Amino acid sequence: MPNSQFDTRCRGLITDWTDSGQMKPFYNIESPMRPMVEISGKGEVLVLCSNNYLGLADHPEVIEAGVKGLRDYGAGTASVRFICGTLDCHRSLESKIASFVGTESALSYVSCWNANEALFPTLVGPEDVILSDELNHASIIDGMRLMFKSVTKKVYKHSSLEQLETLLQETQSHPTRWVVTDGVFSMEGDVAKLPELVDLCKKYDAMLVVDDSHAVGVLGTGGKGTHEHFDLLGEVDVITGTLGKALGGAAGGYIAASADAIQILEQRGRPSLFSNALPATVAYSACKAIEVIENDPSIVARLHSNVATIRQGLADLGFDCTPSPTAIIPIMIGDEAEAIKKSKQLFDLGVMVIGFGFPVVPKGEARLRVQVSAALTDAHIQQALDAFAKL
């Protein structure tokens, strides 16, 4: 039966968000994810808000691989991994991921959110310490909440090496310290100070975990991620990432680590023990996406070139764009309603850029987030800059 207090609360929230201009629009897309998409009731618009960083979501080889996976294995596994849900294509994908990012082994998940929810409760011991950057992704935060209550959790200010070292010094009596960071921070677009983090973890015998979801396929000459960008392949203990961004854009996530760590995750990680395995069509698509990158690393170079061009173009228009090699360019607005207003203005001009406010970012720090793709042509980039010039 309906609950009147619940109904009243829901209606009040919706009314407040609507009146304050904080309601987020949901656009219905009627075409594949590519630079120009068809929006229901609008027509064709230029997308500058997609995670399709390398333009592989509609790559012919990636699509054909997914179709083959669907034909060969059907719609899904209908089982968790340890019962009858492990397909040979899962093993092929996991071997491909481990080889690509440079670890002993890897395990796939239906999302990187699931991967981070599996990682911390499974591998972190009850007397361990987690040291987490304050701007880490929500999936890391939620994964940490699922750990033993006895685990000590401390948050250090964003990229503050001084505070992190102090925390490492203060927690040396604990069995294992885990330093956890995004490789690329999704709302700031900046890169973790990985060389210094590696040095600190070696100095204090701590484990280093990097969520490279917005870096894999983006950073490094081969698109391997943050560790390749800094020439630190093999120096990160645990890497988590997604298959739903640069690596085909479909879905899925992974943990890449030592063979022992992966075996423990297989045996005890709850997300893969209690939910179906990744569909074969996604495994095939992701495998092919990695092959495309390996066979043609110039696609990564095109992304880097597009990022530099758009970032400079926005700076020339007077927008405050912090220098960064990543494909994420935040434009700070402050007021959430104003950010959403500017997003709608851009949409009316045929360019899709999303305004982000609370709870995705802190109150008072609303922003537009531009996301760049290797698939953008010079004409697309000029169209985008022309629209921003009219704001």
Describe the function of each predicted region.
Residues 119-138:
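Conserved PLP-anchoring active-site segment centered on the Schiff-base-forming lysine
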Residues 11-73, 206:
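N-terminal "arm"/small-domain region of PLP-dependent enzymes with the aminotransferase-like
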Residues 296, 301-308, 315-349, 360, ...:
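Conserved PLP-binding catalytic core of the aspartate aminotransferase-like
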Residues 134-143, 364:
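Short, glycine/polar-rich helix-capping loops at beta-to-alpha or helix-loop-helix junctions
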Residues 64-111:
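Conserved N-terminal alpha-helix of the aminotransferase class I/II PLP-enzyme fold
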Residues 60, 64-68, 72, 95, ...:
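PLP-dependent enzyme catalytic core of the Aspartate aminotransferase-like
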Residues 52, 154-210:
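Active-site phosphate-binding strand-loop segment of PLP-dependent enzymes
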Residues 204-207, 214, 219-325:
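Active-site C-terminal subdomain of aminotransferase-like
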